[in-house]
């Protein structure tokens, strides 16, 4: 398989970070037993990381020992229009600091993605009144039951964290508009936007796909340079460069 990360990579890591051991069958039929359950193993070479990411070229993975995490019992999900990509990166840092590292997901969603999405899936609710040029979908989660305690104002501690961060970011000009889910149904609706976007790209026409990994500090300049260069070649190309901002992984797709 690949060293995939997925939507929650910012909190839990990539496949290599989550895999403690493997069983692999080589091309000649030999079985390699690497099913250690240890988080730290100082013995010999770490062969499992050669197989993870090789996509079957070195052998077939037939079993795996995985690291597991407690499921969050409380979460707060928000969709925000941000000033630009650099503002999105700064917002991520603020949410991480305010929540004590509880960010479950932080997804970059530009306007082109939403334009394509609503062409083919108009029934999906728009998170905000207007479509902003650059947006983020973010979620924080906690395994502490107290984080879900409703106070006299109908608020929870984890939601208060999100509200405070967004309010400060709005005052500082990082955030233009935002909404926080108040129910599971509203949370699901926000996630529908992100999870349906790839399907809309397929319907829109030919898609040039890429999977780019960058340092967070380089994302804003990369995005600006790529947009300028591509638009100079063909202004009609829609740039659907969404992705996991938390680990610097962008699916910089062109439609």
Regions found by a protein language model. Give the residues of each.
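Noncatalytic alpha-helical scaffold of FAD-dependent oxidoreductases
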Residues: 1-255
């Amino acid at each position: 398989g690949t060293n995939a990360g997925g939507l929650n990579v910012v909190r839990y890591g990539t496949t290599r970070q989550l895999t403690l051991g493997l069983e692999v069958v080589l091309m000649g039929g030999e079985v390699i037993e690497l099913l250690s359950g240890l988080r730290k193993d100082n013995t010999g070479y770490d062969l499992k990381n050669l197989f993870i990411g090789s996509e079957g070229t070195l052998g077939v993975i037939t079993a795996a020992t995985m690291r597991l995490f407690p499921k969050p019992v409380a979460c707060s999900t928000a969709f925000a229009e941000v000033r630009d990509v650099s503002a999105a990166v700064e917002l991520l840092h603020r949410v991480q600091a305010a929540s004590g590292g509880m960010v479950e997901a932080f997804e970059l969603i530009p306007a082109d993605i939403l334009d394509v999405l609503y062409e083919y899936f108009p029934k999906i609710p728009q998170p905000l009144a207007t479509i902003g040029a650059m947006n983020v979908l973010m979620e924080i989660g906690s395994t502490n039951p107290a984080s879900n305690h409703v106070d006299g104002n109908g608020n929870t501690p984890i939601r208060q964290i999100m509200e405070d961060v967004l309010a400060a970011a709005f005052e500082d000009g990082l955030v233009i508009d935002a909404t926080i889910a108040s129910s599971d149904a509203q949370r699901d609706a926000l996630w529908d936007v992100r999870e349906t976007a790839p399907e809309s790209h397929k319907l829109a026409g030919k898609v040039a796909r890429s999977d780019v990994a960058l340092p967070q500090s380089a994302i804003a300049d990369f995005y600006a340079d790529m947009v300028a260069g591509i638009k100079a070649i063909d202004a009609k190309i829609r740039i659907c460069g969404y992705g996991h901002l938390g680990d610097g992984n962008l699916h910089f797709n062109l439609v």
